Structure formats: structure tokens, C-alpha cells
Curated annotation (Swiss-Prot):
Primary location recorded for the protein, binned into one broad class: cytoplasm
Pathway in which the depicted protein is active: Nucleotide-sugar biosynthesis; CMP-3-deoxy-D-manno-octulosonate biosynthesis; CMP-3-deoxy-D-manno-octulosonate from 3-deoxy-D-manno-octulosonate and CTP: step 1/1; Bacterial outer membrane biogenesis; lipopolysaccharide biosynthesis
Name of the protein in its database record: 3-deoxy-manno-octulosonate cytidylyltransferase
Gene3D superfamilies reported in the protein's UniProt record: Spore Coat Polysaccharide Biosynthesis Protein SpsA, Chain A (3.90.550.10)
GO molecular function annotation: 3-deoxy-manno-octulosonate cytidylyltransferase activity
Entry GO CC: cytosol
Entry EC number(s): 2.7.7.38
Keyword Nucleotidyltransferase on entry: yes
Source organism (scientific name): Verminephrobacter eiseniae (strain EF01-2)
CDD domains (alphabetical): CMP-KDO-Synthetase
EC class (word): transferase
Keywords assigned: Cytoplasm, Lipopolysaccharide biosynthesis, Nucleotidyltransferase, Transferase
Length: 272
């Protein structure tokens, strides 16, 4: 079964919890979770988008009391985790333990720097796991629209198999077109991947994940993959150890995330 575009979107058919990892120690934008976006801290704005999904519960998982207090001030549920976690997945695994989530309970990892996340996308990624029991994880992607994004190492690409499962994620331009002229990829501003390469269009990975709580705990106990370290992409750990990742294809590009001061100003303008 291959991944389907938005025409076949469905809401999650199993109960799930949204967890939003948040930490203050961003290297490119210190204090990012509490950055003001139209009168709300960014992590609060993310949570308030997520509550419009079908999730039973939306929580922020943080190691900082300031984030905890900001969430409480705006009616957002949050829990305090240890400060020594190596990744957001480790933080969420601790949160699952604190919450006593059963192994089969679905958890959706929504990044705390995605203030324009679509609730419908959260539902679609949650719905992957009941629909695709062979997959340990779910995520999302959309077709790349420009050559600049295709070649940008900050834009993570994903290649799928015929069943809509991820084969590989990379910062490199994949799939690489040996004869780009045959696919209309030559001119600046072209739209590679829109109906080209017989279903193997260049796809931009969207950083949202679903897992069952038991799988998340298992994943954090696995050794890091060499490819994970080389690419600095944590999801490659699952593929390295033989687990499958189902990918929801959406026709709509995700709203801009916030990694830099320039990103922050861009989102502020969008919220005016």
C-alpha cells in the first residue's frame, strides 16, 4: 500500500496524545520556546494549535521551570523532565513513563518550534499507525517546489518505497537525477517532483512523528546509527535497526518552523 495524497486523508482512528518537547538551550535562537509570537510564547502557540487536533491530551515536556510556568499561565498542560536528555525523543520517553502511557498508546511528537502546525496534519500522522501496523513510526512529507530547497541541506529529503514507507532520509538532494533535463529540473525556480519520476518525486520531510509509547521507549534504548550521526538526523536510527517508518503525503507545505531570528520575524509577520 503506497502513501496517498490529501484526497485520502483521514483523522486518527485511535486515541493519541500530543507531546511537545521544549528546551531553552537552542544554539541559534536561545530561549526560543518563550519567544513572543503575537502575544503568546511560541511553545504555547504550538500547543494551542495542537488542541484543535483529535488528540485526547496535549502536553509540553520541558526541563525548564520557566517554560513550565509560561504554560501554566496560559492554561497549557506541561510536565518537567530531566535536563540531561540527548534528544527530544529521550525527553518524550521520560514523559511517557511519567504519564504511565500503555505500550500501545499512540504519541505524536510535535516540535515546539512549529507555531503554524496544522491540526489536520497531526491527525493524519497519528492515523498512520492504526492503518499501517507494520510501521513502528509515522511521519509526513510534501513535494519539493524549488531547486533551491532540493539542494538546501537544511531541507531534509525522504525517499519512499512502493508501499509509502521511508527508504532513507538525507540532507543531500535525493533522489539524485542523473539526467535532470529529462525531469524538468534544470531551470531556476522549476518545480521538481510535481508529478515527475513516476511517483519518486523529491519530497521534503516534515518534522512530526507518531509512535506507540512502547516503541518510543525501545527506540531510545537503541544504539545511535552511523548514518544518524553523519546526517544529524535522529529518525535514521529506526531505519538502521530495521524498523519501518510510514509517511503521510500532504499536498500542502508545512508552515515555516522557527530555527533562527530571521525565521522568528517571518512567522511574526504571518501572524499580523
Amino acid at each position: 500500500m503506497s502513501a496517498a495524497p490529501d484526497a485520502q486523508d483521514s483523522t486518527a482512528n485511535d486515541r493519541f496524545t500530543v507531546l511537545i518537547p521544549a528546551r531553552m538551550a537552542s544554539t541559534r535562537l536561545p530561549g526560543k520556546p518563550l519567544a513572543d509570537l503575537a502575544g503568546l510564547p511560541m511553545v504555547v502557540r504550538v500547543a494551542k494549535r495542537a488542541v484543535h487536533s483529535a488528540a485526547d491530551r496535549v502536553l509540553v515536556a520541558t526541563d525548564d521551570a520557566r517554560i513550565l510556568q509560561a504554560c501554566a499561565a496560559h492554561g497549557v498542560e506541561a510536565i518537567l523532565t530531566r535536563a540531561d536528555h540527548a534528544s527530544g525523543s529521550d525527553r518524550l520517553a521520560e514523559a511517557c513513563a511519567q504519564l504511565g502511557l500503555a505500550d500501545q498508546h499512540i504519541v505524536v511528537n510535535v516540535q515546539g518550534d512549529e507555531p503554524l502546525i496544522a491540526p489536520e496534519l497531526i491527525d493524519a500522522v497519528a492515523a498512520l499507525l492504526p492503518a499501517r501496523p507494520e510501521a513502528g513510526m509515522g511521519t509526513a512529507a510534501h513535494a519539493i517546489a524549488t531547486l533551491a530547497d532540493y539542494h538546501n541541506p537544511q531541507v531534509v529529503k525522504v525517499v519512499l518505497d512502493a508501499r509509502g514507507l521511508a527508504q532513507y532520509f538525507s540532507r543531500a538532494p535525493i533522489p539524485f537525477a542523473r539526467n535532470p533535463a529529462e525531469h524538468g529540473w534544470c531551470s531556476a525556480g522549476a518545480a521538481p517532483g510535481m508529478g515527475t519520476l513516476a511517483g519518486h518525486a523529491p519530497l521534503r520531510h516534515i518534522g512530526i512523528y507518531s509512535y506507540r509509547a512502547g516503541f518510543l521507549r525501545q527506540l531510545t534504548q537503541l544504539a545511535p546509527a552511523p548514518t544518524e550521526t553523519i546526517e544529524a538526523l535522529e529518525q535514521l536510527r529506526a531505519l538502521w535497526h530495521g524498523h519501518r517508518i510510514a509517511v503521510h503525503l500532504t499536498a500542502a507545505a508545512a508552515g515555516p518552523g522557527v530555527d533562527t531570528p530571521e525565521d522568528l520575524e517571518r512567522v511574526r509577520r504571518l501572524l499580523l
